[in-house]
A protein has these predicted regions:
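Bacterial N-terminal signal peptides
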Residues: 17-27
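Beta-propeller folds
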Residues: 30-278
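N-terminal secretory signal peptides that target proteins for export/translocation
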Residues: 1-14
Length: 278
């Protein structure tokens, strides 16, 4: 009886651990969505967005405190706080990137507006104000915390956080030449969305460029956004057709010059789905 009970308790504990790990995995996969959470850099606490504020829960007691209040998330000349989709902290956790006013791209809301909250100064500043509304994608702090890079309309930009100066690192982006993100095929088949990486020294950015100019178009009908339908063309390679060309380059923050990597193989027949600094 006791042996059976012990085995049952062990299996129950194992099941609990499995469920907890699965919960953590799914939460981390989707922490960008409201209701998820994000671990602190030291692993001793985690953050959640609750009631328009950011809460910090410290382990093991799971004690809670307001890390960022809704007043801190309220822009000047506004009576309501930002509708936060997700948060990204700088390496020193003194600044926070806030993603809001989002729009769907294919399956996920990856376009939107980004704001930077400087916790020490208490300042809340919108990024990319000279670019179209809700057009910024995949904003990331530089490792030194002095700048933020993001994609808008298939070009990559870097914004100095001290001066708010915005520099275009690429300028050839179009609906078929895609810098810093991916086309439908890469997202659908490989879950590739975020298409650039900061270098550890904050002096350059490595990025993907997708050339879909020779891909045949698949036409969709948009019947929902207006009283008249609209034809929406999508570059969509059918089975047996040649897919998009892909290459990886490294662009200098100082002069915006790109050095293309010499990668063996056919750029249209060989997929490049992962790339990181090591």
């Amino acid at each position: 009886m006791y042996k059976t009970k012990a085995v049952f308790n062990l299996k129950l504990k194992q099941k609990f651990v499995f469920i907890f790990i699965l919960f953590v995995f799914l939460s981390l996969q989707g922490y960008s969505q409201r209701g998820g959470f994000k671990w602190s850099s030291d692993g001793n606490s985690y953050y959640r967005i609750e009631n328009n504020s950011v809460m910090q829960y410290t382990l093991p007691e799971n004690s809670a405190k307001v890390l960022i209040s809704k007043e801190q998330l309220t822009p000047k000349n506004s009576s309501s706080p930002l509708d936060v989709r997700y948060l990204i902290s700088s390496n020193d956790e003194q600044k926070v990137l806030i993603f809001t006013n989002t729009k769907r791209v294919w399956r996920l809301n990856t376009k939107g507006d980004y704001w930077v909250l400087d916790i020490a100064k208490g300042s809340l500043t919108q990024l990319g104000t000279s670019l179209p509304e809700s057009s910024l994608m995949f904003a990331k702090f530089s490792p030194d915390g002095k700048a933020v890079a993001y994609v808008s309309d298939n070009n990559i930009y870097v914004e100095d956080l001290n001066t708010s100066d915005i520099k275009a690192l690429t300028s050839d982006g179009s609906t078929t030449l895609i810098n810093g993100t991916f086309d439908w095929a890469y997202e659908e088949e490989f879950a590739c969305r975020d298409g650039f990486r900061w270098s550890p020294d904050s002096k350059s950015i490595a990025y993907w460029q997708i050339d879909a100019s020779d891909i045949g178009k698949f036409y969709l009908i948009n019947n929902t956004d207006a009283i008249y339908s609209e034809v929406v063309p999508i570059e969509y390679p059918k089975v047996g057709e040649t897919p998009s060309a892909c290459k990886v380059g490294v662009v200098s923050i100082a002069d915006a010059k790109t050095t293309w990597m010499n990668i063996p193989g056919d750029s249209r027949q060989h997929y490049l789905v992962r790339m990181e600094y090591i």
